[in-house]
């Protein structure tokens, strides 16, 4: 399960960078704490479907684009 979280986090980070968003701006747009976004991107935490949906809205993509 930990490996899945790391892959998902890496995909979120890659998509965020592709969109040209700094982590702090991304966190602000998603209404999440920047440190929490960092933990997500490093695969240190499992996120809920609700949080994944919020992140996809900010990134302008579908969840399937982020899931490994």
Question: Where would I find each of the regions flagged by the language model?
Answer:
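Base-recognition residues in the alpha-helical recognition helix of bacterial helix-turn-helix
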Residues: 34-39, 50-53, 68
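Short alpha-helical DNA-recognition segment
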Residues: 20-39
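Short, conserved catalytic or interaction motifs in soluble domains
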Residues: 3, 42, 68
């Amino acid at each position: 399960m930990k490996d899945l979280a790391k892959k998902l986090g890496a995909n979120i980070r890659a998509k965020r960078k592709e969109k040209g968003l700094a982590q702090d701006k991304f966190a602000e747009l998603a209404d999440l704490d920047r440190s929490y976004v960092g933990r997500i991107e490093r695969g240190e935490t499992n996120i809920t479907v609700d949080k994944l949906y919020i992140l996809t809205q900010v990134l302008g993509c579908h969840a399937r684009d982020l899931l490994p």
